[in-house]
Amino acid sequence: MNRPVHNEHRRKRFAKKCPFVSAGWKTIDYKDVTTLKRFITERGKILPRRITGVSSRFQALLAQAVKRARHVGLLPFVGED
């Protein structure tokens, strides 16, 4: 038995461009809190690549910068409720 294919349930996936690559960034500074907050949820979690469109290299640099900013005290470990 084959299932009927419903076209309304299929979604086209668009290739997301990495904002850091398109802007020409080489590294991510942990002191740039406004940029880091764009990639963090309200709860303080780092957003995944599939949502943000960040490349794998910059996702690793982003995670490292967020963790450094948390330890220094620039970003909270847990977001406000």
UniProtKB/Swiss-Prot annotation:
Pfam families: Ribosomal_S18 (PF01084)
InterPro entries: Ribosomal_bS18, Ribosomal_bS18_CS, Ribosomal_bS18_sf
Keyword entries, A-Z: Ribonucleoprotein, Ribosomal protein, RNA-binding, rRNA-binding
Family annotation (Gene3D superfamilies): Ribosomal protein S18
Keyword rRNA-binding: yes
CC terms in the record's Gene Ontology section: cytosolic small ribosomal subunit
Swiss-Prot/TrEMBL GO biological process terms: translation
Source species, domain of life: Bacteria
Molecular function GO terms recorded: small ribosomal subunit rRNA binding; structural constituent of ribosome
Protein function: Binds as a heterodimer with protein bS6 to the central domain of the 16S rRNA, where it helps stabilize the platform of the 30S subunit.
Protein family (similarity comment): Belongs to the bacterial ribosomal protein bS18 family.
NCBIfam families xrefs: S18
Name of the protein in question: Small ribosomal subunit protein bS18
Organism: Chlamydia trachomatis serovar D (strain ATCC VR-885 / DSM 19411 / UW-3/Cx)
Lineage: Bacteria, Pseudomonadati, Chlamydiota, Chlamydiia, Chlamydiales
